[in-house]
Structures are given as C-alpha cells and as structure tokens.
Amino acid sequence: MTHRDREGAGGLVRVPGMRIMVSADMEGATGVTWTDDVVPGSPQWDRFRRLFTGDVNAVLAGLCEAGASDVLVNEAHSSQRNLLLEDLDPRARMLTGRHKPLSMMQGVDSGVDGVVFLGYHAGAGFDGVLSHTYLENQITGVWLDDVPASEGRLNAAMAAEYGVPVLLVSGDDKTCDDARDYSPEAELVQVKECVSRYAAICLPPARTAELLTGAAADSMARAGREERQVGTHRIEVEFDASHLAQATAVIPTVEQIGTRRVGFDAPNMTEAMKCFKVVTAIAAGAVQGIYG
C-alpha cells in the first residue's frame, strides 16, 4: 500500500535529532468521501475530525519511533481548526488557525529536515476523492511551469525551495499516482481507492494506522536538508466562469490570458504561492450565488 509496498524495508533505522513538519489536509484522510465529512459544523465532520486526528497520530508514532525529536503539525484544511488538540500525540506541536503567510506550508522555512503531506488529494480537473485545488469548484485547473499542478505538487515545489524533502504522502490512489511524479522518492500510503469524486473503497482506521506508522518510520531514512532549488516560476489558473478571471486580473502581476484563464510569473516559489493565495481569495469573493 506504499510506494515501495513496504517490501525489503529491513530493520528500523533511527535518525535521531531530526525536525519534521506534517502538512495535514483532510480530504485524503481515512474514510473521507463526502462533502459533509470535511465541512466544519456538520455531524459527519465531527466524526471524521477524529479519524483525521487518528491519522496524524499514526504518522507521529512512526516519525518519533524513527528518531524525530521535534514534529510540527500544520493544520491545513479549510478553517485549519479541525484537528483535536486534546487528542494529539503529546510529542508533537500543532500550528492551527488561518491567515498563515505560507498557508499549508507554514513552518517549512524554519529549518525542518523533512515534510509529510498527510490526507492530501488529487488536483482540480482530475479524478480523485474530493479532488480540487484550493477552491472546491471554481478552479478547474492549475499549471506550475506548464505542468498540471495539485496542491501536493505546488507544496513540494515550495519545500524544494527550502531544501526540505517530501518524506511521505497519504491519500487515495489518485493522490499517490500524482505524488509518484512530483516526489518519486517519497513513501506513499493509499488509505482508500477512488470510485468517484464522492465514493471510495476505504480501509478501516486500524489498518490505515498500521500503514501510516510503518511508512512514516521508513520515511525518516530520507530526512535531512537537501540543496535548495530556487528559481523563477509561472503559475496559470483556469476558472469555471469568465468573471473570475476578470476579477483576479486586477492584481498588478496577474494577466488574463484566456476567457477563463490567468497567469503570472514570480521570482521564486514562495512569492508565486503568495500571489496564488491572493488569486484564490479574490476568486472566492467574486462568486455570485448559484451562478458562481
């Protein structure tokens, strides 16, 4: 169920003293398949935030078992206030709440030795459980340097800018397929198999916990700073309606390049993602009722 199918892993190799960050999203968590599972306030959300917290704790167990001395969990879904702090493994710290300068990747610039993408999902325009990129429906596609980009690909590019390797990615099978391309050395944990955007064949929490803990421990063999990959980047965003492209093109660095498409260049990935966040915020604010 992981990229290396957990074969031939041998004995556990401890890597002491490593600082790790976990970027935790919810759509790719154990059992999640439906909108109400991840929308704050619904009865289903209250149930699945516990499963989400369980996934995080399973990863924390593996990271700490393999020698991680400091783990920061960046809560990265929606309001970014979904994980249950009172149930979190006490060996971790949690960054919770919105309006973080680096959003899902807040903390990657603090000298960490590796990052885990937990509960991730496929990008807008692709098959996958609850697939999207930042906005649930308004964005139909994102491209990073002419390559279709999920949140995982965008975040991996930011991690590379700080010399931080992606150690592990978890989610459905489509998420794992995506990660094989943008982070081929990462451990992968498939917690469910996509049937449609709103249906999946799911493994029970006891099984996913075992997989997540084992893969997290194995992933620590790759922990350690790498050479920073800094350079210019271009992001293009396609929307489901023309007025969203018009609205976001008011940003000085953003150009409307098609009826529903905008693009912009940035000197580095950090600045690219800051601009992308502004694009998504303006687009979300321009949605008008059932017409979008």
Language-model segments: which ranges?
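Active-site glycine-rich loop that binds ribose-phosphate moieties when present
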Residues: 100, 136-162, 170-174
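Short catalytic helix/loop segments, enriched in acidic residues and glycine
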Residues: 36-60
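Glycine-rich loop at the start of a catalytic domain that most often binds anionic cofactors/ligands
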Residues: 78-91
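Short glycine-enriched loops at secondary-structure junctions
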Residues: 23-29, 77, 118-124, 173-174
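A glycine-rich helix N-cap at a beta->alpha junction
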Residues: 90-108
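Extreme N-terminal starter segment of soluble prokaryotic enzymes
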Residues: 16-20
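Active-site rim beta-loop-alpha module in soluble metabolic enzymes
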Residues: 158-220
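C-terminal accessory domains and tails appended to enzymatic cores
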Residues: 208-292
